[in-house]
Amino acid sequence: MLVYQDLLTGDELLSDSFPYKEVENGVLWEVQGKWVVQGAVDVNIGANPSAEGGCEDEGVDDQAVRVVDIVDTFRLQEQPAFDKKQFVTFMKRYIKNLTPKLEGETQEAFKKNIEAATKFLLQKIKDLQFFVGESMHDDGALVFAYYKEGSADPPFLYIAPGLKEIKC
């Protein structure tokens, strides 16, 4: 199994259990999230509670909640929305911190394509949800979620050069 960690913080952000597709010249990875129910679920065992005097809600766990699988699996923490100015400020700092950690061709490709990827994200800024890794470190990567028209499940966007592949 492969796990992808934030290169700056070491937070686990993704694994190969969630396939990705490259967008914006490979600078961004798009990963499809899915709403799931967490906690116990009602199991119908064929009994007729009304005939047996049981309560209709018997056996239902009130603690069951809906979560997005990626957020739950990697304990991503949602952040307040950014406006354009805040986002550009974050990206400048992130690029400054990440670039020296990249090597050779990866660094060159990142420098060449990050501006277009940033513009791509800026076009969606009003629709984005922002997440950080479990440590909630200020300098860590942001993970972006949004909803495509007609879809109930959000895709997530990762800045690919900021991820470090670890074999487990």
Curated annotation (Swiss-Prot):
CC per GO annotation: cytoplasm
InterPro entries for this protein: Mss4-like_sf, Mss4/transl-control_tumour, TCTP, Translation_control_tumour_CS, Translational_control_tumour_p
Q: Which residues form the TCTP domain?
A: 1-168
- Record keywords: Calcium included? yes
What SUPFAM superfamilies would the database entry show? Mss4-like
- Main localization of the protein described in the UniProt heading: cytoplasm
Molecular function terms from GO: calcium ion binding
Where would you find the membrane-spanning parts of this chain? none
UniProt keywords, alphabetically? Calcium, Cytoplasm
Give a single Pfam family match: TCTP
Q: Where is this gene product found?
A: Cytoplasm
Role this protein plays: Involved in calcium binding and microtubule stabilization.
UniProt lists the family membership as follows: Belongs to the TCTP family.
Task: Enumerate the PANTHER family for this protein.
Answer: TRANSLATIONALLY CONTROLLED TUMOR PROTEIN-RELATED (PTHR11991), TRANSLATIONALLY-CONTROLLED TUMOR PROTEIN (PTHR11991:SF0)
Name of the protein this chain belongs to: Translationally-controlled tumor protein homolog
Gene expressing this chain: TCTP
